[in-house]
Amino acid sequence: MVIAKGEEWGERVRKSDVVYTRNDHDVLTLSASPIKGDIARTVGNGQQKRLDVEKLKTGGAWHQLPFDVIEADVNGATFRAAAHIRVGHFLWGECHLLCNVAMFRGRRVFQKSHPNDGKIEVLTIERDMKLRQRLLAIMRVRKGSHLPHPQLKIWQTTAEVMHFQRPLPIFIDGVKVTTSDTLRISVIPDAINIYIPSDHK
């Protein structure tokens, strides 16, 4: 069940097989406590300076957080993203950023995003937007604000079929997986759990 307004997120558990992860994609296949990447930054777990080996060995106390993922169907293959999907390039042409988390490359892009709200956050940059305007927008995002511009659009969805004017590179959690002119996305609520030390909550 996705989080409701005013509810506490997750629950305290004891678990012995938690693994510290250093990139966003590994949380899909492991009992992960991310310490690097945009997921770690979103949940406030990116400041770990050393591994708590005893906690891992003894099944120490963790806060278990249910987490949505984005499922993407493209060119007959299915991929899952824990953090984000990028289509195209920020500095030229058509570009789309599809996020499950508030952060992208360490910057808060989506102010109201929550990784367990059952929604995908989307930022669309139209292909005709000039380089100077793109750079200004990126600078504003780095400062935690947005540049209003008719060729920038921010919206939410739970499922979408996206058609592009030409084949574009598609990056899943920072890794290029294919090139396509069509992408089908949907959110899978509560798809995985991630873990942060219970004293962080």
What are the language-model segments listed below?
Residues 68-70, 122, 160:
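Well-ordered beta-strand positions enriched in small/hydrophobic/aromatic, beta-favoring residues
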